[in-house]
């Protein structure tokens, strides 16, 4: 007999669904979630589209705009569900913004943002194959380093 493990729905908080396969741990790390918050993490769950996805449920957490932008950079197809009293009150797909301030670190060691106390600023030049350019040193970055 096949047994299924059922995960209890959250009452108040956030569900991040359709996270690209195996990226939920990265999303979890960049959100700096308080240790005491109940969290459910599902990895490599089959989706209706025939691919795998990850799901992250966080009881008692409301995401900031910066949090949503960070998620969009890691998993551009993710969906955010805001839950209140056990019901979805808001659902939206993340969207990579045209400009990102202060949440990514420039990989150019000579960039002024790495030498002085200046907030980083990046332009998103291309969304489908992510191209991000530092507005200070003009360098395109290949790897995303979340700065806070």
UniProtKB/Swiss-Prot annotation:
Gene Ontology cellular component terms for the protein in this record: aspartate carbamoyltransferase complex
Cofactor note: Binds 1 zinc ion per subunit.
Pfam families: PyrI (PF01948), PyrI_C (PF02748)
Transmembrane segments annotated in the record for this chain: none
Co-factor(s): Zn(2+)
Any one GO MF annotation of this record: metal ion binding
Protein name in the entry: Aspartate carbamoyltransferase regulatory chain
Organism: Methanococcus maripaludis (strain DSM 14266 / JCM 13030 / NBRC 101832 / S2 / LL)
Upper classification of the organism: Archaea, Methanobacteriati, Methanobacteriota, Methanomada group, Methanococci
């Amino acid at each position: 007999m096949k047994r299924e493990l059922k995960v209890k729905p959250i009452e108040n908080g956030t569900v991040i669904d359709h996270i690209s396969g195996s990226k939920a741990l990265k999303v979890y790390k960049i959100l700096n979630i308080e240790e005491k918050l109940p969290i459910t993490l599902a990895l490599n769950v089959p989706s209706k589209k025939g691919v795998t996805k990850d799901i992250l449920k966080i009881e008692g957490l409301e995401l900031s705009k910066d949090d949503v932008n960070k998620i969009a950079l890691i998993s551009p197809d993710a969906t955010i569900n805001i839950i209140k009293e056990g019901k979805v009150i808001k659902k939206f797909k993340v969207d990579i913004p045209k400009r990102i301030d202060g949440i990514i670190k420039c990989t150019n060691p000579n960039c002024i943002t790495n030498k002085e106390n200046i907030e980083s600023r990046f332009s998103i030049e291309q969304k489908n194959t992510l191209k991000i350019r530092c507005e200070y040193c003009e360098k395109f970055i290949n790897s995303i380093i979340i700065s806070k």
